[in-house]
Amino acid sequence: MVILGSTGSIGTQAIDVVLRNPGRFKVVALSAAGGAVELLAEQAVALGVHTVAVADPAAEEAAARGPGGQGAGRPLPRVLAGPDAATELAAAECHSVLNGITGSIGLAPTLAALRAGRVLVLANKESLIVGGPLVKAVAQPGQIVPVDSEHAALFQALAGGARAEVRKLVVTASGGPFRNRTREQLAAVTPADALAHPTWAMGPVVTINSATLVNKGLEVIEAHLLYDVPFDRIEVVVHPQSVVHSMVEFVDGSTMAQASPPDMRMPIALGLGWPDRVPDAAPGCDWTKAATWEFFPLDNEAFPAVELAREVGTLGGTAPAVFNAANEECVDAFLKGALPFTGIVDTVAKVVAEHGTPQSGTSLTVEDVLHAESWARARARELAAG
């Protein structure tokens, strides 16, 4: 397999799964942005990979030197550098590609892996969301295995019946660290507050997206694209314990739920090993201890991101790309103190509204997506700057 984004949250946990299962998996290449070159080099030596890629050309020499500049006495891997390096790796000779890159820059590697016939273990939800029609046009049935805990849960629960028997998908959300706050209270949230997620350990962008529930909105769009279920049959409920990762309700009134303690190694291992399960991938539920699982309706007034995502997903075309790109810029502005917490989604909504009728249909191209993203980023920066 190839692991893209190996130094990030998903990538490091995937490597943990690989190292704890010697003989089961073989990693042949790694890629990273280039900000954690020492870690990338250490991973390369530990896994014995033959190729690494860094998006930042300035990191090429450091990556080639290996950990501590020495390479630990092993042959150093081949180093690819530049913005297209991960895309080149995605089409390399292998069985599967784990796309753990954060953001829409993961679109090109996603398309490259699918076109090359690789099994795509997808953690980079943004590539599916911004390039939905493009990705679906090249993906073969069963070629995409989702790694998001929610979509991995739906993936498993959907096996409980025929697709025609599905009444609705129920996507759970922890609610983030601010689930009981009003919109007025949310206006005072600081970056430090928002980066402290109560359940999951994630990178900064995903952590902020979880706090605003933009992440849940993206997951609703992703569920629609992965499973061809209409938006009006995809429900979001708040589940603070994050043990039930999602549910499928069938036409006879029965509901299939996937439950496990919050540990991303579980869905990662499922994706890496599919169609087989990896023994002891993560601890299971302790059924000998009393526990309470709570479910609450989502407060759409305080957290409008999910409803905005539904609107964007329904529009389709380039609208999801605009939504995602504007959000990435607004998160950056919030972290720099240029936008209040509530200003993130408010500004994204303004950019989406200004975008108007999106480019859509069978004529959608990668260039259309990139152009829409570029415009959305520039407009979001303008609005954030006041």
From Swiss-Prot:
- Keyword Coiled coil present in the record's keywords: the answer is no
This entry's Enzyme Commission designation comes to 1.1.1.267
Entries under InterPro entries matching the protein: DXP_reductoisomerase, DXP_reductoisomerase_C, DXP_reductoisomerase_N, DXPR_C, DXPR_C_sf, NAD(P)-bd_dom_sf
Binding residue positions for Mn(2+): D148, E150, E219
* Membrane-traversing stretches: none
Cofactor dependence: Mg(2+); Mn(2+)
Which residues of this UniProt protein bind 1-deoxy-D-xylulose 5-phosphate?
K125, S149, E150, S174, H197, S210, N215, K216, E219
The entry marks the following residues as binding NADPH, namely: T7, G8, S9, I10, A33, N124, E126, G203
Q: Its GO biological process terms?
A: isopentenyl diphosphate biosynthetic process, methylerythritol 4-phosphate pathway involved in terpenoid biosynthetic process
Q: Which UniProt keywords apply?
A: Isoprene biosynthesis, Manganese, Metal-binding, NADP, Oxidoreductase
- Cite the Gene3D superfamilies for this sequence: 1.10.1740.10, NAD(P)-binding Rossmann-like Domain
* Class in the EC hierarchy, top level: oxidoreductase
Q: What does this protein do?
A: Catalyzes the NADPH-dependent rearrangement and reduction of 1-deoxy-D-xylulose-5-phosphate (DXP) to 2-C-methyl-D-erythritol 4-phosphate (MEP).
The UniProt family comment states: Belongs to the DXR family.
Q: Report the protein name in the record.
A: 1-deoxy-D-xylulose 5-phosphate reductoisomerase
What organism is this sequence from? Kitasatospora griseola (Streptomyces griseolosporeus)
Q: Which classification does the entry list for the species?
A: Bacteria, Bacillati, Actinomycetota, Actinomycetes, Kitasatosporales
